[in-house]
Amino acid sequence: MFPMVTEFMNYGQQTVRAARYIGQGFMITLSHANRLPVTIQYPYEKLITSERFRGRIHFEFDKCIACEVCVRVCPIDLPVVDWKLETDIRKKRLLNYSIDFGICIFCGNCVEYCPTNCLSMTEEYELSTYDRHELNYNQIALGRLPMSIIDDYTIRTIFNLPEIKT
């Protein structure tokens, strides 16, 4: 008879403990009920990126002196720089410049160490394609200026996300 009483007491304690845990979870749920939603409706609403956002790289062909500093500081030796030495003026002439964004880690070293500032980071982050070979951008594609999110009238921009209260 004694073991049956202890089992009944354990059952009662477990029931009380379970009810307490459910109550704690329910209180957390209720505390989040009066907060604003954090999610945004992505294709129709977009956040304004910060000033130092590291998006797609913009390249200015005329400023580049083909020094290949960007290739040396890149952790994965990504930029492909093709140049030809002009013997009469003893300078390099840039022939081709390309970056494969399928491999790029967007670290920003190439932009930071470029002596002529011909590379810059843009706010463009929508680079997804169905074919990975389309992510290999040449100097013409890199020179294209991105359309700003603010200028697109079909998208509602959200300047700052509501702060999350902890």
Swiss-Prot record:
Example of a GO cellular component annotation carried by this entry: chloroplast thylakoid membrane
Cofactor(s) it depends on: [4Fe-4S] cluster
Chain ranges of the 4Fe-4S ferredoxin-type domain: 55-84, 95-124
InterPro entries (UniProt xref): 4Fe4S_Fe-S-bd, 4Fe4S_Fe_S_CS, NADH_quinone_OxRdtase_chainI, NDHI
The protein's Enzyme Commission number: 7.1.1.-
Xref: PROSITE patterns: 4FE4S_FER_1, 4FE4S_FER_2
Binding positions ([4Fe-4S] cluster 1): C64, C67, C70, C114
Gene label: ndhI
GO molecular function: 4 iron, 4 sulfur cluster binding; iron ion binding; NADH dehydrogenase (ubiquinone) activity; quinone binding
Similarity comment text for this entry: Belongs to the complex I 23 kDa subunit family.
Stated name of the protein: NAD(P)H-quinone oxidoreductase subunit I, chloroplastic
Subunit structure: NDH is composed of at least 16 different subunits, 5 of which are encoded in the nucleus.
Reactions catalysed: a plastoquinone + NADH + (n+1) H(+)(in) = a plastoquinol + NAD(+) + n H(+)(out); a plastoquinone + NADPH + (n+1) H(+)(in) = a plastoquinol + NADP(+) + n H(+)(out)
Domain of life of the organism encoding this protein: Eukaryota
Cofactor note: Binds 2 [4Fe-4S] clusters per subunit.
Topology term for the membrane: Peripheral membrane protein
A Pfam family this chain is assigned to: Fer4
